């Protein structure tokens, strides 16, 4: 397929497979940031109700920055990867204190925000500001694998970037990326454009039996009440993963130990 045909196809598929999402209805930068951090490692169906609850409680950067981290973690609980909540909280504080409440719109400024890497910065530039910025993630890889790398073999993002540069709709980058994402999601459901082709592919580790599972259990337990280590161990039927999970949460600043009582960071 040549790039001209591909661009027309993406426009068609964008209309055919469009998915309504609250952060698409309102593309203010704060909403896009919240959605992008939530969508890291978490499926859209699980994110939408959490996003709506989060925005209802923390409607803007100022409200989020002024809230204790413990409130943010309580609302985040269930999404997993709780460090994302801490990054979001720190970002809100940074926007208020260092950016005078003005959300950065350029890549350099966005990359200074906690938890924002190249892909998240690119997503914010496209979705919030409608500025064409190249970024690649799983659904995007899926589409380009299917149409330009059908012969198999490992493909690096550096192989995809020139094609993305040639095919991105520079006048309507927001709609282009929405279309790519929605089409890629549909392709994956059909079992085509497999991400295993990517040189960057890493299979996500299973939650069951992992330290990550215990971290989530500790956070959920502490959303209800402060507890001693013995109380946590007894409640969670602690095994060898417990100590690693507990020390990791302390190191990440998600929980604290005050006079023998563990609690969510205020």
Question: Model-predicted segments: where are they?
Answer:
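Catalytic cores of DNA base-excision repair glycosylases
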Residues: 2-213, 226-240
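Residues in the recognition helix of alpha-helical DNA-binding motifs
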Residues: 124, 245-248, 264-265
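Accessory DNA-binding and partner-docking regions appended to nucleic-acid-acting proteins
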Residues: 210-215, 264-266
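Hydrophobic residues on short alpha-helical segments
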Residues: 215-222
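C-terminal non-catalytic scaffold/interaction domains in large multidomain proteins
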Residues: 222, 262-263
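Short amphipathic alpha-helical interaction segments
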Residues: 236-250
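A short, conserved structural fragment
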Residues: 250-262
């Amino acid at each position: 397929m040549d790039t001209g045909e591909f661009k027309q196809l993406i426009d068609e598929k964008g209309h055919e497979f469009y998915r309504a999402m609250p952060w698409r209805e309102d593309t203010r930068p704060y909403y896009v940031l919240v959605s992008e951090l939530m969508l890291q490692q978490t499926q859209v169906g699980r994110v939408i109700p959490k996003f709506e609850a989060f925005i209802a409680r923390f409607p803007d950067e100022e409200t989020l920055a002024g809230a204790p981290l413990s409130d943010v973690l309580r609302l985040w609980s269930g999404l997993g990867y709780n460090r994302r909540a801490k990054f979001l909280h720190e970002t809100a504080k940074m926007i208020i204190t260092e950016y005078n409440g003005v959300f950065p719109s350029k890549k350099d400024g966005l990359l200074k925000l906690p938890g924002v890497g190249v892909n998240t910065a690119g997503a914010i530039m496209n979705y919030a500001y409608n500025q064409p910025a190249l970024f690649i993630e799983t659904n995007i890889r899926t589409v380009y694998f299917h149409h330009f790398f059908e012969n198999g073999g490992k493909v690096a993002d550096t192989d995809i970037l020139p094609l993305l540069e040639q095919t991105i709709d520079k006048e309507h980058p927001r709609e282009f990326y929405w279309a790519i994402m929605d089409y890629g999601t549909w392709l994956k459901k059909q079992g085509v454009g497999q991400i295993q082709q990517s040189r960057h592919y890493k299979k996500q580790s299973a939650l069951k039996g992992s330290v990550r599972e215990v971290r989530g259990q500790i956070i959920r337990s502490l959303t209800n009440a402060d507890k001693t280590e013995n109380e946590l161990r007894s409640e969670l039927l602690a095994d060898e993963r417990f100590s690693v999970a507990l020390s990791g949460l302390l190191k990440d600043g998600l929980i604290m130990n005050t006079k023998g009582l563990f609690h969510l960071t205020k």
